[in-house]
Amino acid sequence: MRRLPPKGDPAYIKKSVDASLLYLGVDYIDLYYQHRVDPDTPIEVTVGTMAELVKEGKVRYIGLSEANPEQIRRANAVHPITALETEYSLWSREVEDKILPVVKELGIGFVPYSPLGRGFLTGQIKSFDDLPPDDYRRYYPRFQGDNFIKNLELVSMIEQLAAQKGCAPSQLALAWLLAQGENIVPIPGTKRLDRVRENLGALQVSLSREELARIESISPKGAAAGGRFPSQA
């Protein structure tokens, strides 16, 4: 898989925003993210440019994605950061030690992407062959070989707990995320309306301390086998 490098220089940001406004046919963007931090452009320059767009009325709020604690603090010192988007789920819990405390301290909303483990935590994927030949997930370590088998065992236990709770595995996974903090707003992706409704049902799932402890025992930090991204990333 080929991944394009992030760009955060002023010229690129301004060009991208203008193009987005034209494409969407709107006067402003509610929340504009810098998706991945550009290693070649100081974060202060990137956020400073985004702040100018706020003053111009083209952008209302600024967000970052996959930024580390130092970058978050430096960015927030230039202009208030409204949201940080980073992967977080029952099988990707790396943010808990350093990222979540910082965003909570600074009053920044946290937006977990891939809250359902790229679909794995839904219980709908039972074998590698369930993934279409052109599916990007085939390149991800957690969906390959022995990692897949081990992760399937983890999901099986989540499915059992969800069945006892009377909800879908996806709803249990999302409810767990929502229980981690009031500033957390997960963004599960889907192409189907019935899945949207199912995901929204997570708002009606309340987890007790005992249930949260049970989930913790099933999927503690580091429980997932394999890395988050392909080695090329």
Where are these regions (language model features)?
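Glycine/proline-rich, positively charged
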Residues: 1-94, 98
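Conserved, mostly hydrophobic/aromatic
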Residues: 20, 29, 42, 62, ...
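Aromatic-lined glycan-binding groove of carbohydrate-active enzymes
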Residues: 95-133, 168
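Glycine-rich beta-alpha junction loops
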Residues: 68, 88-92, 114-121, 176, ...
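Terminal-tail/helix-coil boundary detector
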Residues: 105, 133-164, 179, 183-184, ...
